Amino acid sequence: MAVTLDKEAYYRRIKRFFGSWKKGDDEFANVDAIVVSVGVDEEIVYAKSTALQTWLFGYELTDTIMVFCEEKILFMASKKKVEFLKQIANTKGNENANGTPAITLLVREKQNESNKGNFDKMIEAIKVSKKGKRIGVFIKDKFPGDFMKSWYDILNKESFEKVDISASVAYTIAVKEEGELNLMKKAASITSDVFSKFFKDRVMEIVDADEKVRHGKLAESVEKAIEDKKYLGGTDPSTIEMCYPPIIQSGGNYNLKFSVVSDKNHMHFGAITCALGIRYKSYCSNLVRTLMVDPTQEMQENYNFLLQLQEELLKELKHGAKICDAYQVIMDQVKKQKPDLMSKITKTLGFAMGIEFREGSLVINNKNQYKLKKGMVFSVHLGLAELNNKMGKKPEEKTYALFVGDTVLVNEEGAATVLTNVKKKVKNVGIFLKKEDEEEEEEEKDEAEDLLGRGSRAAALLTERTRNEMTAEEKRRTHQKELATQLNDEAKRRLTEQKGGQQTMKARKSNVSYKNASQVPKEPELREMKLYIDKKYETVIMPVFGISTPFHIATIKNISMSVEGDYTYLRINFFCPGSALGRNEGNIFPNPEATFVKEITYRASNVKTPGDPSVPSLNLQNAFRIIKEVQKRYKTREAEEKEKEGIVKQDSLVINLNRSNPKLKDLYIRPNIAQKRMQGSLEAHVNGFRFTSVRGDKVDILYNNIKHALFQPCDGEMIIVLHFHLKNAIMFGKKRHTDVQFYTEVGEITTDLGKHQHMHDRDDLYAEQLEREMRHKLKTAFKNFIEKVESLTKEDLEFEIPFRDLGFNGAPYRSTCLLQPTSSSLVNTTEWPPFVVTLDEVELVHFERVQFHLKNFDMVIVYKEYGKKVTMINAIPMASLDPIKEWLNSCDIKYTEGVQSLNWTKIMKTIVDDPEGFFEQGGWSFLEPDGEGSDAAEGDSESELDDETFNPSEDEEEEEEDSDEDYSDETEDSVDSEESADSEEESGKDWDELEEEARKADRESLYEEVEEQKSGNRKRKGHAPLPNPSKKRKK
C-alpha cells in the first residue's frame, strides 16, 4: 500500500514544536535556527534526530537534513523522500494555512559536489532567521557517510554558535497524544504477554526439570518468542522488535542497569531477575521482574518493601510535580524505615520513554528539576543490589538482588497508571518447593500423598499455570471494560461532529418530455385522438378529455392489455404519492402536492367497420408493444446510470514499456468480465495492475485505489488467490465492483466417483505427486510476483497473508466458509462472493445465541458508520468463541454477548435517529450481560452464567415466561431463515416433531416402559420453553 503521512498529526506536532521554541525560557528559546541531520548508521538504534523524525512523520528518513527557521522549514532528501514529504508541503498561495511555516523541499543529488547549491540555500536561510548566529543541534548525534561529512564541513566553516537542545526537545515530545498512548499500551501488553506466557512458564519448567540453562541461551529464546504469533495475540510480527536484548541474571552476579548483556553462566535457582522491553511501531515499553525460588523470610520482607516503595513512587508521579521531589520522597521513606538499604537501592528510579527507550534528560533522580505532565510515560524501576543472604551456603547463594519495574502513565490527578499489568506479589513471583523431610512427614500422615513423591514441583507448576490462565481472563475482562468506556466516548464525540452535516434526501428525478411546444410531434395520430409513442423523447402521448397529453415513460408504473368480447382494453398505471414503489424507484416526488393521475384505461373495438383501413384496436396493441420496448430500454439505461453513481474517476494507467514487468499468466478473474469465464494475464505497471483476457478485455486497478491487497496461498485450498479490496468501486461488465480477485485452480475441483480406486494405484500416486509439485510451483510463482510488485512500488503496496491458525468457520452468506484474520481485516477470499471486513471500521462485535446447549452461535459486526448495515456471520462453532474473543481483545475491539437474536435494523435506526438520547441512556452498555436495557431480562432468565439460585418475583416470572415463549417461537421460525441454514442440529425441528419420532422409535423397539415414561413427560412438557442451561449444569 502507498506510504501515507498523517498530515493532521504532523500539523499538531510541528505547532507544538515551534510553540516550545518561541515560548520557552531556556537555551532552546534563544537559538535562531534548528538543524537536524540524519545519516545512515545501522549501529545507532536510538537518537534524538531519528526520534524527532518519527514523531513528526511516522517514519525514519535517512540521509535527510532538516532546517527549522523562524519563518520557514527546509527539508533536503532524496527524490523518493521528497515525494513523500510533498504530502505536507504548502502549496503556493497557501503558506501558513495550517498555522505552520512554509516548507521548501530540496532534492539531494547522488554526487556530493552537486549538493553545494542546496547547502548554500540552507546556510542562507539560517543566516536570515532571527539573528542568524546561534543554531540548535543534537550534540551527541553524529552520523557517518560522505553526504553527512560534506554537510558538517560546510556548517563548521560558518561561525555559528552551536547549542545542544536535546533536553528541551525531549521535554516537548515527552507528552504523548492519544494515538501514541495506544501504541505504548499495545507494546506494554505484548511485553506482559511474552513475560507471562513464555518466560515465566519456561523458568518454571527449568526449575521443575532441574535443567541447566545458560542466561544467554534463555535470553535468545525470549527474543525468538516475539516471532511466534501465539504470544503476540494476532499482532503483525514485522511491527515488533526488542528495545534491547533481554537481561537475565542470577547466582550472585547482578548489575541492575539496562546497558548490560546476559552472561553465559548457568541460571541459579535463587533470585532470578529479568528485564524485558518490546517496541511496537517505534514506541517502547519495559518490564522488570524478579522470580524467587524458595525465598527466605528476609528476602520476602525486602521484596515487599520494594513493592511498597514502588507504590509510593506511583502516587508521587502526577501532573505538576517535580521529578526530584518524587525521588526525595522515596529516599526519605527508605531512610526512615530501612536505613541499612540506603546504600543498596538503585541510584535512579526510572526514566521517561517513548520513541527512545531511555530519555537521559528525564531521569528520576535528585537533580532533575523538570515538572511532570499528564501523558508522559515512564519506566519506573526500583532495585536493591548486593543484599546478603544469611542462610546461603554456596557462593552464588550468599548474594542476591531484587529488581521490579513497570511502564507507567502519568495522570492529571491520582497515582500513575501501570500499563504492564503483570502480577508481582510474592505469591505470584515466588516458586515454593517442598523439602525432602516435609515430603517424608506427609508420607507418614497420609499414604495417598505418597503418589506425589518428589513431583511436588509439578504440582507447583500446575498451580502457577492455572493462576496465569485466570489472570489472562481477568486481564481480558479489564481491557474490555476500558474499551467499553472508550467506545462510548469516541462514538459520542464522532456523532457530535457529524451532527452539523444534514443528510439530503434524494428526490425522484423529474423527467420533462418537452421543454417547449415546438418539440411536440405533429403526427396524424394526435389529430385522430390515438395513442402515440415518441421514441426519441421516450414519451407516451395519450388523449385525455380530448387533449393530447404527453407522459414521460418514467411516470408509467406498468401496463396491461386484455381482450373482452369485441373490445380490447389497455390499462396504464402511473406512479403517484401513496402508491407502493419498488425498492429502487425512490419515494419522494418533486412536487407531491400536485394532482396526479393514478390510472387510465382505453377501450377500442375489435370489429372492423366498413371503410376503416384496419381494426381500431390495432392502435392499442401497437402502443402496448412499443411502450414495453421503450420502458425496457429506459430501465436498462437507468440501471446502468445508477451503477455509475458515486464512481470516483480514476487516473489513467501509466504503462511500463519494460518487458521485465512482473507478470502472472493463466489467471481467471472474479467477477467475470463476460458470462463465460476466461483466462488472462495480470501485469504490474508504473501506477497499477492491468488484467488482459484472451479476448482482449482489459481491467485496470490502480495502486492508490487498493485498500487491502490479499494473498491467499493454496495450503488447504483448491485455488490460489490474489484479492484486491478497493477504496472506490470500479466499473467493468456494466457493473460496479469493490472486490476483484485473480486466481488459478491448483488441483481437480471435481472427483470422479465412478472411478475404481486402489490404495497403491500408481496413477493416483503419480497424480498426487504432480499436484504437490504444482502447488509448490504456483506458490513460488505468486510469491515472486508479490515480491517484485512490492519492490516496484517501493513497498507502497504491501500484500497481507491471512493467519490460518486464527481462522474459524462461519456463514457470512448462504454457505459456511473459513474466515481468517489478517493484520488489518477479517477475510474469506476462496468463496464467492468474498468477505472482507476492515478492522479499523469496526465499532464493536456482538455474539448472539451464546447458550449452554447450542453448538453454534452468531456474530454481528457493527461499524463506526452507523448508517451502514451490520454484518452477520452465522453458525460459528461454539469452540471458536474463546479464540475469537482473544483475537478481538488483542485488536482493541470491544465485544459483547447475549442469548437472543436482536433486531439490528431497528436498533441502528433508533441510534441514528437520536444519538444523544442513546448515549445518555448508557450507549452500548445495554449489550452487556449486567447492563440495563433489552438484555436485562435475558440476564434474569436463560443467560444466567453463574450457579447461584435465583428467586424471581411474580412480575419477573411473568416476564421470564414471555421472553422464553418469544425465544421458543423465534427458534422454531429460524428453520426457514437463512441465518440458521447450517444449524439444523439445534433448530431443525420443533419439540412436537422430535417427540413424535421418539414415540415411533420406542414403539418399534417395544420399549413399553420407556414409552410410558416419555408420554408422561410429553404431557408434563407441552410447549415449554427451552431448558435452562444453569439447571443442566447442576445435575
From Swiss-Prot:
It is found in: Nucleus; Chromosome. GO terms for biological process: DNA repair; DNA replication; transcription elongation by RNA polymerase II. It comes from the Eukaryota. Residues 491-520, 920-1035 are annotated as: Disordered. Residues 499-519 have a biased composition (Polar residues). InterPro entries: Creatin/AminoP/Spt16_N (IPR029149), Creatinase/aminopeptidase-like (IPR036005), FACT-SPT16_Nlobe (IPR029148), Fact-SPT16_PH (IPR056595), FACT_SPT16_C (IPR048969), FACT_SPT16_M (IPR013953), Pept_M24 (IPR000994), PH-like_dom_sf (IPR011993). Residues 432-500 form a coiled coil. Residues 986-1006 have a biased composition (Basic and acidic residues). This is FACT complex subunit SPT16. It comes from Xenopus laevis (African clawed frog). The gene is supt16h.
